[in-house]
């Protein structure tokens, strides 16, 4: 599985984005979702200005957003006993500065918010969406389960509540 994580942001609160941890989370999510071992994923961290440009260009919405996903081969999750087809999963672009604002509003660490956003972006690449309330509940519950599973696996405490667009899903869901 090819996972490339690049931090082009100037986010420097503390040590910046832990690209190794992000890479490990991405691998965990792809494994849990039974994505083919030969699939390729790119994760890019960008500044507010770059994210704002992408947001206008692709969504025709002003200002930066937290995460954007750019699917390539329309891969879907695998099933029990079967992985997805191999191919290019696509790109996930995260803005750590927006993540920091959302983390503060939600009461958890920026690093946890970045992990949530990367998981969220990967789920979008796999065909998940949150346009309807039922889709949102399914996607946010899955994203939270994946991040909590990853944090448990690496032995790091945390209980981040998913946020997207500055809206939080209650932690009990």
From Swiss-Prot:
Which cofactors, by name? Zn(2+)
Q: Which GO terms describe its cellular component?
A: cytoplasm
The free-text cofactor remark is:
Binds 1 zinc ion.
Which PROSITE patterns does this one have? UPF0054
GO molecular function annotation: metalloendopeptidase activity; RNA endonuclease activity; zinc ion binding
User: Which UniProt keywords are given for this protein, alphabetically ordered?
Assistant: Cytoplasm, Endonuclease, Hydrolase, Metal-binding, Nuclease, Ribosome biogenesis, rRNA processing, Zinc
Q: What does this protein do?
A: Single strand-specific metallo-endoribonuclease involved in late-stage 70S ribosome quality control and in maturation of the 3' terminus of the 16S rRNA.
What protein name applies here?
Endoribonuclease YbeY
